[in-house]
Amino acid sequence: IKTKLSHEDAFSKYLIGQGAKINKPYGWQIKILSPESFLRKIGPVLEKRLTESKFRGLTRMLKMNFWKYELGLWFEDGKLVKVEQTSDAGRILGMNPYATIQLFLGFRSREDLEYAYPDFYVRDGLGELIDVLFPRKPGYIHYCY
């Protein structure tokens, strides 16, 4: 019997406790076509994570360099007020476009990605902030094939 459930839900944990086998999830084949739109959409989640951290009330702009373009995330008093492309050259957050999807979706941590991808980097002591905004979390993508 295949359950097609996350390994983190209560029922799956029960089945595992009864001796069920865990299959590795199939590789993620996800592409975020517009990181700008995606980050706007998850803005309330990012704001909640800030509120529950030492970064409550954050006011600053984060520049994410995606090789061909940069995105600026403007936070004011802990609220994400603007996400848009910027032309300013910045090399503080180097976002490998392929690896960043794993960060945004919680599949890999910032440290995992910095280790695996030399062109994924977080400088100027922003690692902890990125960890708060994009923590590693269990997830499951249901696929229908």
Regions from the PLM with identified roles:
Residues 1-145:
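Intrinsically disordered, low-complexity, positively biased terminal segments
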